[in-house]
């Protein structure tokens, strides 16, 4: 919930079969090449099963890529153009190719309190009631007021 995903970001971007004699898609999109051939259903099932996980309140920048089977923690930021090949811890900012941690978005104690609060599970009315606090309070003051 509340994930911010910029234009041209790719999440769970597909890979090619590195363990086969050819990388080309004629071997798994075979029906596009021959009338008597079928697509490789097992290959597509394997690709669908390799999903990326995106946490709550994340920001994935323009043209970033999040590879399959990678987890982006709650509150994390993926910089524009980054290629994420490993899990990103909650409230961590990553950048580069391959993506590497740049710094924590928030001090660990505040991040832990936000994780415990889980405001992203609040209903619409509670979010609206806290809107001014989201806009004006520091993270620490917000947590003090809202029980995190």
Model-inferred region functions:
Residues 134-148:
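C-terminal amphipathic helix plus adjacent low-complexity
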Residues 99-100:
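A short acidic/histidine/glycine-rich donor-binding loop in glycosyltransferase catalytic cores
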Residues 117-123:
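C-terminal boundary and immediately downstream tail of ABC-type ATPase nucleotide-binding domains
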Residues 73, 77-79, 83:
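A generic "structured core" feature
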Residues 1-70:
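Flexible, glycine/small-residue-enriched loop-and-beta-strand segment within the central core
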Residues 73-74, 89-91:
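Conserved catalytic segment of ABC-fold P-loop ATPases
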């Amino acid at each position: 919930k509340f994930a911010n995903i910029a234009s041209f970001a790719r999440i769970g971007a597909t890979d090619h079969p590195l363990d086969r004699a050819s990388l080309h898609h004629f071997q798994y999109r075979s029906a596009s090449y021959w009338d008597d051939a079928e697509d490789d259903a097992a290959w597509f099932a394997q690709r669908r099963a390799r999903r990326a996980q995106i946490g709550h309140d994340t920001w994935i920048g323009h043209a970033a890529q999040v590879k399959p089977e990678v987890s982006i923690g709650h509150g994390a930021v993926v910089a524009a153009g980054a290629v994420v090949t490993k899990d990103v811890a909650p409230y961590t900012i990553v950048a580069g190719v391959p993506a590497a941690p740049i710094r924590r978005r928030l001090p660990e104690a505040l991040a832990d309190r936000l994780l415990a609060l889980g405001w992203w599970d609040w209903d619409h009315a509670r979010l609206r009631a806290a809107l001014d606090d989201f806009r004006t309070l520091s993270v620490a003051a917000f947590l003090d007021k809202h029980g995190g």
